[in-house]
Amino acid sequence: MAEYGDPDTEEWKFLRQHSPYQLLRHDRLGIAEDGKEMTADDMWTCPKVLFTTSTRDDRVHPGHARKMVKALLEDAPAEKVPLCLYWENTEGGHGGAADNKQRAYMWALTYAFLAEVLGL
């Protein structure tokens, strides 16, 4: 695949099976890939997750992270999403931070999240 998001039909079939957003969409609709109705026990459960992004990212639009967080917080059953955190830097670019101070802050958030998840 030359570019993520390529509309090639065969590649889309593969991507759809691995995309957390697409998997969540199927669960929300209650329909499995084989067309059978899903039960609550069949549904995908989200791990604890932290999304970081930048408003000024010129390669991956922050709308992708926003859309996933919205789906997790508003569309998924609460018991399926144990922890969902979101941080968007209004300055940085594709790397998420505009300077070392912002980069340090972003990494501090990341390490604090990992410490929480790992029980440290």
Regions from the language model: what does each represent?
Residues M1-L120:
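Active-site-proximal cap/loop segments of hydrolase catalytic domains
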